[in-house]
Structure formats: structure tokens, C-alpha cells
């Protein structure tokens, strides 16, 4: 499976705090931002760099910068917005694209009700953010939309993933790497990740 479980002590610690049944909206929201920041560091580890000259205090010196077009971060509405600030803390120059999906009542498959992409998508790396990778339907649909725009360098950043969701993404898009804080046990009969986080969107927005 093309999945990278970020096994960092701080990531594991913060994720456990989010799993607590009495985790407040404020605490859950804050931890989602902190985790996204830590995980984005790992997801950006292989960014390509290039050399260039700068004027330093002692004269001209050679330095490094990220090569190519600026990253676009792609939150899946609505829960993905809860991770956005964490990624932007680390990469404040990132451009933001947004995808909103809902389930078709007849086919039960996710369909887009809103999408807004930045320019030059075919030249930018894209980082999709969503707290939960459950069945994988929304993630696969979002990747489909990005590839239709010509995007070739795509990664997914999720807090918790189920094996079923990882398999769905790997089967449909084996070139996309998934970064997650935990690969959990399974989905229950209602499609919730076990042990998971519950409804991450409700917890982030305080609508539970």
C-alpha cells in the first residue's frame, strides 16, 4: 500500500488526545491544526529544491529555495478546513483550492457541488487535506478532479485512515501517496473508522 504512517512521538501523543471521548471542540480543533502542521513537515520532505544567489551580510552567497510553482492545498469541505491553518503555518505561501462533495442519492457515489482551483494546476504539486479517510470515495473523487485539471504531483494528508479507504485510493490512483497519523482497524457497519475519531467535521465545527 502506498501509505506513509507518520510514527512521531508528538503525532501519536496529540492523536490520542483527539480520540478521548470528552475532547472539547476547542481542544479537538486546536489539535487538528497542530497535527496538520507536524504532518505537513513530513509530506513536504521530498520537495525539490534549486540553488540561487542572495546578498548576505558578508556578500553574495548561494542558498536553496523550493523549485517550481507554489504548492496548492486542497481541503475537502467541510472537515478539511480544520487542517488548513496547520499547513499554512508551515507553508504560508501555499495557494488554496477547494472541493465540496456530496453523495448522489441514487448512485451513492460522491459528486462535486463546489470546486474552485487556482491557476496553473498542471504545474503545481497538490496536497489534499481531510481528517478522515474512511471508504475513500471522497478522496478518489477529489483526485479525479485534480487530475482532470492536469495535476500530476498529488499527495493526501489525513489524520486517520481505514484500510478500506487506503485500498480504494491505491487501486484507483497508485501514484498518490497517503500520509496519515494512524492506520486504524476497520470500518463499522455505519462507515465509521474504528477506533477513529468519531465525526471529525462535527467535532471541529461544534455541531455534534
Curated annotation (Swiss-Prot):
Mention one GO biological process in which this protein takes part, according to its record. Answer: uracil salvage
First-tier enzyme category under EC: transferase
User: What InterPro entries does the entry give?
Assistant: PRibTrfase_dom, PRTase-like, Upp_B, UPRTase/APRTase, Ura_phspho_trans
Q: Which Gene3D superfamilies match?
A: 3.40.50.2020
Q: Which GO terms describe its molecular function?
A: GTP binding; magnesium ion binding; uracil phosphoribosyltransferase activity
Where is 5-phospho-alpha-D-ribose 1-diphosphate bound in this sequence? 78, 103, 130-138, 199
Positions of uracil binding: 193, 198-200
CDD domains recorded for this chain? Answer: PRTases_typeI
Keywords attached to this entry: Allosteric enzyme, Glycosyltransferase, GTP-binding, Magnesium, Nucleotide-binding, Transferase
The answer to whether keyword Nucleotide-binding applies is yes
The record's catalysed reaction(s) read: UMP + diphosphate = 5-phospho-alpha-D-ribose 1-diphosphate + uracil
Q: Its Enzyme Commission number?
A: 2.4.2.9
Q: Specify the superkingdom.
A: Bacteria
Cofactor binding remark: Binds 1 Mg(2+) ion per subunit. The magnesium is bound as Mg-PRPP.
Regulation of protein activity: Allosterically activated by GTP.
What cofactor requirement does the entry state? Mg(2+)
Transmembrane segments annotated in the record for this chain: none
* Summary of the function given for this chain in its UniProt record: Catalyzes the conversion of uracil and 5-phospho-alpha-D-ribose 1-diphosphate (PRPP) to UMP and diphosphate.
Give the family from UniProt: Belongs to the UPRTase family.
Spell out the protein name for this chain: Uracil phosphoribosyltransferase
Which organism was this protein described from? Neisseria meningitidis serogroup C / serotype 2a (strain ATCC 700532 / DSM 15464 / FAM18)
Taxonomic lineage of the native organism: Bacteria, Pseudomonadati, Pseudomonadota, Betaproteobacteria, Neisseriales
**Gene (name only):** upp
